[in-house]
UniProtKB/Swiss-Prot annotation:
PROSITE patterns: ZN2_CY6_FUNGAL_1, ZN2_CY6_FUNGAL_2
Example of a GO cellular component annotation carried by this entry: nucleus
Organismal lineage: Eukaryota, Fungi, Dikarya, Ascomycota, Pezizomycotina
Organism: Aspergillus fumigatus (strain ATCC MYA-4609 / CBS 101355 / FGSC A1100 / Af293)
Gene that this sequence comes from: amdR
This protein's name: Acetamidase regulatory protein
Chief localization: nucleus
Length: 772
């Protein structure tokens, strides 16, 4: 053993002399856990890896840090000298050369001569742009690759780090001391798991029963990255555009598939500037680079799309950070567009949609977009644009807040912006989805108030109960007021209606699912929570399946991944039902959701981490096998054997009846009856004393000018008919995409599966949710 340790501690040098390495080196596992390692003494594997049964023990090697050069002394870029044997291209006409130069100069302070690259650099930039958008990436010369590609060792290290980031969901509690919080040391990222509404907090607290008051956990080491582009080339790179044909394609794709539902840019004005090619009035280069990024997201295949988006994002971010664009309205627009970029999965705090929504909110409130511009001196076109941008910002802020369980960047109590009207969309093109934007703004505004009243840190328990009752009533009323073309339908689902109902049903699950051990909300559940959550999860998986079959998943925004994550957690619980019919039905929905998540991973990097979470779950694989066969043992404990036998008998009868005759849909007169608040016993619910500000229902926060009139609702009854929360165009169409027979009898079982420690612990058995 000592000889082995001696061999491992010695390393040959270039002159044949062995040199003893430092004894402080540790293996990769001990280095990640920040514990002492004795690999240099006892050899490999070390004592810690032997005790934990790890077989891949190896010495951790530090990454070599590249020498950081001064800005005044950049790394010289070697370019291939022109060869006499190669064909020399003919000189382009003067109009062809001057047009892109003037077009890319989006600000008056830089003259076309200053914006144009030097003579020695121009051929390289032009060839890079042409090569980038060709289908073949192998035509680049070795010299050009040497100019733009990092060393092979750095590329391999970056690939390994990227693979570790993708598996970070299964590494948080891999250590023996993973049952408790690990010290957050210097150089290690702190992970905020969000409040009780987030899926991260849900899974973590279901696994860690002693960490109710812990919201920050230790993550991975902070990565070190080097600047790959020379400082003297950043301006030239940021002002560079691809070939005109590709620019036309991406701009058209953006205004066809994205801007109609998120009218951030006034299409008529922008396209007029874009087509005229007027050097004195060009479109903002920052806005154009951001539009190219979003257009690339919805058009090109993955390999080419990732490369193009990285380049467009680098250019747009450099222009944004260096304040090349002086119009703050354009900065808000660009920040909202940059939320479509899927940055590296190692950071969703200072990158990705959460970061850019916060940046847009800061600039917008600094400009005063949250106040109603009543001054007559305000240009009508700018007033319309401000109102659109403000409500789109509210939408994205609410969706990203639900995704991560983080506070909203916008407090609507500080805003008095008037509701959106059809006139606010003037100049946004013929394809603009006016009704969708208006109703989606109403939904997100309502969700914002519900979250604050229901999940606020300083909200009393009485107010929480009242907020849940008001939330269900307001959501049902909003659903009933939807126009026919926005209502939920079984087929031909367009991306706008899909995003509307995905956000709606995602919030239904977050509002009604039991919290782990139900700490602060133990008495806030209702008699139909199981049906509401199961129906909402079924709607979500059906919408994703419809979009996947029609190749429309690419049109969904960032939050679509987390919406599917919420539904898969609900379906994951249903896989453990003792009723085999419900379990097998859940298995089909889980398979469909997994396929949709795998497809979303092609567009959003954080979908890959969630996919790995479910694919690497050991207990999940066991439940998937059990779901394919009849379960002879019900969920009840051994002391409830009479009830278990009765449940088995009822289960067999239900199975035979379902095999003989199809399941009948609910009768039309049962679709939309009146309802009461979803509480365990509405007759005994105490009357809560609320402040004058709190006695308003959530309907009062929806702009009344945009709501269609509906018949008054009946008087409250004892229980809520939860089917009013799900609206369809066809009144004869079944409300649910699946049979709900047998689920009401399993309400307690459903709640216990959510509360118990085992069902979700396998998702974190090899690790946990890690963002940061």
């Amino acid at each position: 053993m000592s000889s082995t340790a001696q061999k491992n501690s010695l390393s040959p040098t270039g002159n044949g002399v062995t040199k003893r390495k430092s004894g402080s080196a540790a293996c990769v596992h001990c280095h990640r856990r920040k514990v002492r390692c004795d690999a240099r003494i006892v050899g490999l594997p070390c004592s810690n890896c032997r005790s934990s049964g790890k077989t891949d023990c190896r010495i951790h090697e530090k990454k070599k840090r590249l020498a950081v050069r001064s800005i005044l002394n950049p790394v010289p870029i070697r370019c291939r000298p022109p060869s006499t044997s190669e064909h020399v291209p003919e000189a382009s006409p003067p109009s062809t050369i001057s047009e892109p130069t003037a077009f890319t100069t989006a600000f008056r302070g830089v003259q076309p001569e200053a914006a144009a690259p030097p003579a020695s650099v121009a051929p390289n930039v032009q060839s890079k742009a042409q090569h980038l958008h060709s289908n073949s990436y192998s035509q680049t010369s070795p010299q050009a690759q040497e100019c733009h590609l990092p060393p092979a060792s750095d590329r391999f290290a970056e690939q390994d780090a990227h693979a570790d980031f993708e598996k970070r969901l299964v590494k948080l509690i891999d250590d023996e001391e993973g049952s408790g919080p690990r010290e957050i040391q210097r150089g290690v990222r702190a992970i905020y798991v969000g409040h009780e509404l987030s899926n991260m907090s849900f899974l973590i607290r279901q696994q860690r029963d002693k960490d109710d008051d812990v919201y920050h956990f230790a993550g991975s080491e902070i990565p070190r990255r080097q600047l790959k582009t020379g400082h003297d080339q950043l301006l030239v790179d940021a002002l560079t555009l691809p070939e005109p044909a590709l620019v036309d394609e991406l701009v058209q794709a953006y205004f066809t598939h994205v801007n109609p539902g998120y009218p951030i840019v006034e299409e008529d004005q922008f396209m007029s500037q874009y087509r005229n090619r007027d050097p004195s009035d060009p479109p903002p280069i920052l806005l154009l680079q951001a539009i190219l990024l979003v257009g690339c997201h919805v058009t090109h295949p993955k390999e080419e799309r990732d490369a193009l988006k990285a380049i467009f994002f680098r250019r747009a971010k450099w222009l944004f950070d260096n304040r090349i664009e002086r119009n703050r309205d354009t900065l808000v627009q660009a920040a909202l567009l940059l939320t479509w970029h899927s940055d590296s999965p190692d950071d969703d705090v200072s990158a990705n949609a959460h970061y850019w929504v916060g940046v847009a909110a800061r600039i917008a409130t600094g400009l005063g977009m949250h106040r109603n511009p009543v001054s007559s001196r305000f240009a009508p076109r700018d007033r319309r644009m401000w109102r659109r941008l403000w409500y789109i910002l509210v939408q994205l802020d609410v969706m990203v807040s639900l995704s991560y369980g983080r506070p909203q960047a916008i407090n609507l109590e500080d805003s008095d912006v008037s509701p959106l009207t059809a006139s606010d969309f003037e100049g946004c093109g013929a394809r603009v989805q006016t009704d969708y934007v208006i109703h989606f703004s109403e939904l997100c505004t309502m969700i914002s108030y519900i979250v604050r009243e229901r999940f606020g840190l300083r909200v009393s328990s009485e107010r929480r109960k009242a907020a849940l009752q008001e939330a269900d009533e307001a959501l049902a009323n909003w659903s009933l007021r939807l126009p026919d073309h926005l209502r939920l339908r079984a087929s031909d689902m367009d991306p706008w209606s899909a995003m509307l109902h995905l956000t709606y049903n995602n919030f239904l699950i977050l509002l009604h699912r039991p919290h782990p051990r139900a700490s602060a909300y133990s008495d806030d559940y209702g008699p139909h929570d199981a049906e509401i959550c199961s129906a909402a999860a079924g709607v979500i998986t059906s919408i994703f399946e419809e979009l996947r079959l029609n190749d429309r998943l690419k049109y969904l925004w960032y939050s679509g991944v987390h919406t599917l994550f919420t539904a898969m957690i609900q379906v994951r619980v249903e896989l453990r039902f003792s009723n085999p019919v419900l379990a097998i039905n859940a298995l089909r929905r889980f398979d469909s959701a997994s396929c949709s998540l795998r497809e979303l991973a092609k567009y959003w990097s954080h979908a890959t981490t969630i996919l790995r979470l479910f694919e690497d779950s050991k207990r999940l694989q066991k439940d998937l096998r059990l779901a394919t066969s009849e379960r002879s043992r019900p969920f009840s404990s051994t002391q409830d054997q009479p009830q278990a036998q009765a449940l088995d008998q009822n289960k067999n009868q239900h199975q035979h009846s379902s095999a003989d005759a199809p399941v009948q849909p609910p009768q039309p007169d049962r679709l939309l009856p009146s309802y009461d608040s979803p509480t365990p016993d509405s007759t005994s619910l105490p009357q809560t004393a609320v402040s004058p500000h709190q006695n308003l229902t959530f309907d009062s926060w929806i702009p009344s000018t945009n709501l269609a009139t509906v018949d008054p609702m009946d008087q409250p009854r004892e229980f809520l008919d939860w089917r009013q929360l799900f609206s369809f165009t066809d009144p004869d169409q079944p409300v649910l995409p699946m049979s709900m027979d047998g689920l009401p009898e399993l309400e307690d079982e459903w709640r216990q599966i959510y509360w118990q420690e085992t069902p979700m612990s396998d998702l974190l058995q090899d690790g946990g949710w890690m963002h940061g």
